[in-house]
Amino acid sequence: TAFEEFLDFIKNAKEATSTSPSGRNYSHYKSLSQGDHCYLRTIHGILETALQHNIVLQRWKSTVTTLIEKDDGKPCIHRMRAIHIIESEVQFIAKLFYVRKLMRNAEKNNLITDEQYGGRNRRQAQTAVINKILYYNLSRQMRMTSAFIDIDARACYDRIVTSLSGLEGRKWGAPYKLSNFTTAFIESQEYKIRTGFGISKDTYEYSDAQPTQGSGQGIAWAGPRWINSSDTCSRIMRKYCAGVHYHDPCGGNEVRKCSDYFIDDTATAITQNTLQSDNDIFQQAQHDEQTHAYTLNAMGHRIENAKSGYYILHFVRDKILPSCGLIHEMEGSITIQEAFDSEPVVMKRLQPFQAHRTLGCHVAINGQSRRQFIVLKKKIQEWAT
């Protein structure tokens, strides 16, 4: 790292951002930057030596995990967002190498598949939602039987396998010393929990018997490392799964895609014209989603079945125009194993008029927007009061 990069990090850091369990927050570093920089040069020299020789300082081994309610006023233990607070020097390493250098190198050399929308420049959550609406519309216009599956990966940042993610980072150009340091840092952490009642006295840490995995939400390298794992998953899905195929009547313009990914949310789709090995739409959907579940599990992750669901779009004649068929008009089910050693579970199937919440939007496969307008009206009324 260059000293100028360290200075630039300090200059752009927000003083209100929580950091450094030791108490060395960004305000201290900004004050030091006003002088002759001799102390900052010493700190940067220590930082550079630690990175080059894979040394994790004792002060860096403490992480405070702050638990924030996902639902205001409902402090349920399974509905807490865990944010890791680490020392600011390590946050500098994470932002410089993973966010700036690795992500930029991956984008420049087209190392990330087009299916990835989260954590990338010039990509938005709205694009993934619009894609889904367009898939729904095209399938309805072409009267093509289709399956659309929405999957949520459980606590994705906290289940990244550290050693595997280090290897995946190498394909994006991560230096060996960086991958080695990141692994050593994660495995050396002693975690404390902070809630509204204070910081816990008891701690938990990595051990060979119970290895603590995950890159930790709140640390700058968590996003790029998850995109790396998710990108591996999307490449496997694209190779072995059916996906969708839409084209114009002349065949001059076409779209072939398997899934769209936004962080932990995955939207998988299958159309009638891509079915493999004489499968029907249910068999193909089960094959593709089981491939997805096994791939995630092999990388340390797991599907959140309670937040997942699927549609089967099919058509029945109603007087003159065909309409989207209900569940009882085309019976079938999809069962998947969330992990290699788990029991099969039946996935939740949705009626065509039921809106599924996708990245904050409520979209129904039959094109109905009633649920979305109800939610928007409620939000507007809350803002107005």
Place the predicted regions along the sequence by residue.
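Conserved pre-catalytic core of RNA-dependent polymerases
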Residues: 1-232
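Catalytic palm active-site di-aspartate
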Residues: 20, 62-65, 81, 116-119, ...
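Inter-domain linker/hinge segments that demarcate the starts of reverse transcriptase
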Residues: 39-50, 54, 97-105, 128-140, ...
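Glycine-rich, flexible loop segments associated with nucleotide phosphate handling
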Residues: 78-83, 203-216, 248-260, 278-291, ...
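Catalytic palm subdomain of template-directed nucleic-acid polymerases
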Residues: 155-173, 255-262, 266-295, 314-325, ...
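Short, conserved micro-motifs composed of acidic
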Residues: 189, 193, 197, 302-354
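Helical scaffold of the NTase/Pol beta-like nucleotidyltransferase catalytic core
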Residues: 228-239, 245
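Basic, alpha-helical interaction scaffolds
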Residues: 339-385
